[in-house]
Amino acid sequence: FGAVGTAGQRCTTTRRLIVHKSIAAELTERLVNAYRQVPIGDPLQEGILMGPLIHEQAVENMMAALETARANGGEVVCGGRRLPELGPTFVEP
């Protein structure tokens, strides 16, 4: 989970995986299952692995990056939806 602890907001965050096509589908399924189990919320609470993005501009930047990926033929297979019930800067991993 190279991006969960910092909500993807540091320069060493995992951005891409290069995976052989023979294992890509299985790896994708396993990663999606793992990310769907990430506890999101107040990072000061025990058991929470992912907190909010730093500010609303960071959320807008993330949404724009996801839209650019889609516009260029990419598929978002997990996450990327806002979580307003947690606060204005929470987004699914």
Name each model-derived stretch.
Residues 1-93:
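ALDH superfamily catalytic-core signature
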